[in-house]
């Protein structure tokens, strides 16, 4: 008897273990939205807390959270900063992971008042949910003058910079600016002023005074960075608008042109004169006077420093990150100050000889600044044209560097010239493809010929009109990143297109998420996107063939072969 019971238990365990072998290959491994983003709320008079418990491997979009009161008045809702998430099609977006708590202050609520909360999220594995809407019933709240102020929102992890350069680049840029013709010749004079004309100071004392001077200059730049970053944080949404991005790109281009010598960009001479007089009144050789001199020097922008400084300030405004803003400008000032400290301690013998090379350094920084408008315009014009702009910039830079290097007389420069010429030839490739139609030829194969449907009735009618042919239904939305990946990487593959040659292709665009879209998704029992359904010649779906989440071309082709009879 015991042996029979043991055998039965073993059989049951074996059944459960091997059951997974027979799971449908298209079966969704994703949980419903209510499990991925468990929503809850709690009200205590004027204070309402909205909470989301976010499942591991999932995230909510910050910009997709909307709160609308009905028969109630609430204070401005302050969404906490999230962490940056990047994808190929939407760039960088702020998201929330793990848990989100959102305090809402209710100033007044009538009986029966509600709060409509809309949010949307995705899974890391490439699966996005339609926007979810929850209705929060509110307890009656009487308005009074003592209503609490909006609750400060706990900050999540500060987002990192969303621009192409790290703050450490500012240190290198500062060092490079020190070798431009407007700055390098001034260092011996500045060194003498800082030391107060005293040539007998000890090395430690001279280094200390110079360090204090650099810190004064860094203080000014850091303050500028903090102010600009704070302003950028307030207008960060506006700074992402295409018109604003185009305007900033034009400004960056003008700044680069000033580095090329087309015009001079600096503070008005009257203001520069006043600042110089204020600096001259300070006593050199004393820590306090030297610090003030450095702080004032940070405001006196020469023609060589104005454009890079302006570019860095606009870069910081785009990031909206105060830590990044202050730190970037501090490192920039420190980079400019390092050569001054070395000259003060070791003397002018460390200075390289002046010459045309300093103008070339200035021109090189013009190309560095030109990289920023290309980065900004790439968000507006897309990847293809962005690649062409990067190509044009690369050809211009390496071509200029190659022509400049021809003036060199040293033998080893021949190797550098070969490298620069090769880099220019590599950079020009995207422009060649564009000019000779290679890109156009590739793009002619990128799209399947889908028939669009909107409602359940249209789907049923399309299944009838298929006349015995198999049908594939692709559920698509603009907010679904993986749907765009399917279009670009999977549906464009020749093997996939060949496998679908005898299949009727339907597509439902549910971007609007309106009543018809919701009804269609509910009818098909779809949790989120991307989801691809397959129907036989009789109009019956094959649930085991359903695809949820992204598949590359090879995997999807194998899936298509497996579903064939």
Swiss-Prot record:
All ranges on the Periplasmic side of the membrane = 20-162, 229-242, 317-322, 378-383, 439-565
Residues annotated as transmembrane: 163-183, 208-228, 243-263, 296-316, 323-343, 357-377, 384-404, 418-438
The record's annotation in InterPro entries points to:
Cyt_c_assmbl_TM_dom, DsbD_gamma, DsbDN, DsbDN_sf, Thiol_diS_interchange_DbsD, Thioredoxin-like_fold, Thioredoxin-like_sf, Thioredoxin_CS
Please give the annotated consequence of changing residue 182 to A.
Loss of activity
Q: Where in the cell is it found?
A: Cell inner membrane
Task: Identify the coding gene.
Answer: dsbD
Q: Which family does it belong to?
A: Belongs to the thioredoxin family. DsbD subfamily.
Q: Name one GO molecular function term.
A: protein-disulfide reductase [NAD(P)H] activity
The protein here is known as Thiol:disulfide interchange protein DsbD
- The residues covered by the Thioredoxin domain are 434-565
Disulfide connectivity for this sequence is: 122-128, 182-304, 480-483
Per the record, what is one GO cellular component? plasma membrane
- The signal peptide, as residue positions, is 1-19
Any one Pfam family match given in the protein's UniProt record, by short name? Thioredoxin_2
